[in-house]
A protein has these predicted regions:
Chain A
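Sigma70-family region 2
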Residues: 32-33, 59, 72-87, 106-108
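Helix-turn-helix DNA-binding module
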Residues: 149-161, 165-186
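C-terminal edge and immediately downstream basic/flexible tail or linker adjoining helix-turn-helix-like DNA-binding
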Residues: 2-20, 112-122, 126, 141, ...
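Arg/Lys-rich amphipathic alpha helix in sigma70-family domain 2
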Residues: 80-84, 97-115, 141, 202-204
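Residues within the DNA-recognition helix of helix-turn-helix
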Residues: 46, 190-193, 197
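Short helix-capping/turn signature of helix-turn-helix
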Residues: 45-48, 56-59, 164-171
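Structural recognition of an alpha-helix C-terminal capping motif at a helix-to-coil junction
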Residues: 52, 66-73, 86-98
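Short, charged helix-capping/linker segments at alpha-helix termini
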Residues: 32-41, 51-70, 208, 213-214
Length: 214, 250
């Protein structure tokens, strides 16, 4: 009865799910015992996080889709090893980061894609002053997104993962260190270095060229 | 705290990753330094831009396709025949990670074996060479030559020249290393090596001719001075009391 109720809670937002650990634990138990319906529920409630992080790590939708598929297969395979006192989504993030690293190593395609994106950003950055007057805010926002994507592309893989988890996902430094299997000091150093590089990138491509400042 | 130090800490300060004490010091500096305050503002703006790093809105069809593929794969895995599992099990040893581990273990084992083999192989001949060199030295010491105050021992029964040691055991065995004091103060100064030799039948110089057929114990000590050598001969029956007592010193 409880499980039926649980399966009907499909429309719960992700942040509510993270607070309702009992409900999630129930789904996990059922999935471990081979219930694919329960596992599908787990996928539904974590797919957005996995896809988003994969896209941020890899830079394109096709790779993000492949990464998400591999992540969920690994989650299903190793769900029995998941400890109930762990944070499930931190565990999923850890798998996602590992999968994205594997995919990036195998394909080496994301570098070229980011590089082409970076070129686009550079070209568009020169056009920013012309857009100042009567600017279309949406277009500026798009350019800023491209700019920040270009900045992320310049980061080494470990720094990118650290700053994604810390500044965008908003995880505490210790949690980031646990996900990346590193020390807090190392993560802090990576984050500091990444922030410096992003600031320098923004200076070069936006602020010093008379672009928009938020 | 100067500007250089603050510049290093600013990336962590804007993300609130600094400890309270350091953060307070940076904040205090920012109030008085316009340059650093401007830099801090830029870090903040870069951080705001970072929040724009959003992926495009994925359609529900995309998510559904991912889930369907995952579930299909899980279904396929669950219906995999046992023979495929067996093949997977057989294939596992040839996976790169396993192969690396096995290769490393083999390399370590071979290295250890080679080390012990070489160590044993080189120590054996070395020890033999040392023993032979010691033997040669002692032979030199035993052989009468020039002005050395060597004892003249009776030769063999078959009439060899007296003075030659009839026989020296093949492997002279060092019994001890003693310290011979030559100074009045008794300060240990000169190492003296002693060696024991078994001689065969001796005669002539021994006062008691009846003992010529007895074994003679020769104890030789070489001081650091090559001109001084102490040699003791012992005949077991010379002293009636104890056969171990020395009978003659040269």
């Amino acid at each position: 009865m409880l499980s039926e109720i649980a399966l009907n809670r499909n429309d719960l937002p992700v942040n509510v799910l993270s607070e309702n650990q009992t409900w999630l634990q129930l789904l996990i138990k059922r999935a471990v015992s081979g219930d694919t319906t329960a596992f599908e529920q787990i996928m539904i409630h974590s797919q957005q996080r996995v896809m988003t992080l994969s896209w941020r790590m890899l830079g394109n939708e096709a790779d993000a889709r492949d990464a998400s598929q591999e992540v969920f297969l690994r989650v299903y395979k190793y769900l029995g090893r998941f400890k109930q006192d762990q944070d499930f989504f931190a565990w999923v993030y850890q798998i996602t980061v590992n999968v994205c690293r594997d995919i990036a190593k195998k394909r080496q395609r994301h570098t070229e894609r980011f590089a082409s994106l970076d070129t686009t950003v550079e070209e568009s950055a020169f056009e920013v002053p012309a857009l100042q007057e009567g600017a279309d805010e949406a277009l500026i926002a798009a350019q800023q997104r491209e700019l920040i994507a270009g900045a992320m592309a310049t980061l080494p893989e470990k720094e990118r993962a650290a700053i994604l988890l810390r500044d965008i996902e908003g995880l505490p430094t210790d949690e980031v260190a646990r996900i990346l299997r590193s020390s807090s000091t190392t993560v802090r150093s990576q984050i500091s270095s990444a922030r410096k590089k992003i600031k320098i990138h923004c200076e070069r491509h936006l602020w010093k060229k008379g672009g928009t400042r938020s | 705290m100067n500007c250089k130090n603050v510049e290093e800490l600013l990336p962590l300060y804007v993300g609130r990753d600094l400890e309270e004490k350091s953060a307070a010091m940076v904040a205090s500096h920012l109030q008085s330094c316009g340059h650093c305050a401007h830099s801090a503002q830029e870090y903040g703006e870069a951080n705001q831009l970072l929040q724009l790093f959003e992926p495009p809105q994925f359609s529900e069809a995309t998510y559904t396709a991912v889930r369907s593929r995952v579930l299909r794969e899980i279904e396929r895995e669950s219906h995999k025949p046992q023979t495929i599992f067996a093949l997977e099990f057989l294939r596992r040893p040839f996976q790169p990670r396993f192969m690396w581990a096995v290769s490393t273990a083999l390399l370590l084992a071979v290295s250890l074996f080679a080390y012990y083999f070489i160590a044993n192989h080189t120590n054996g001949p070395q020890e033999r060479a040392d023993a032979e060199s010691r033997h040669d030295k002692l032979k030199d010491l035993a052989a009468p030559s020039g002005n050395d105050p060597k004892p003249v021992l009776p030769g063999k029964k078959n009439g060899e020249t007296p003075g030659a040691i009839a026989k020296i055991s093949h492997k002279p065995r060092f019994q001890q290393t003693a310290w011979h004091s030559r100074r009045a103060g008794g300060t240990p100064a000169v190492p003296v090596r002693t060696a024991q030799y078994s001689t065969t039948e001796s005669k002539g110089t021994a006062p008691n001719t009846s003992l010529t057929s007895e074994k003679t114990l020769r104890l030789e000590m070489q001081t650091s001075d090559s001109n001084i050598r102490i040699i003791w001969f012992s005949h077991p029956a010379t002293n009636e009391g104890s056969p171990n007592e020395s009978s003659k010193g040269i």
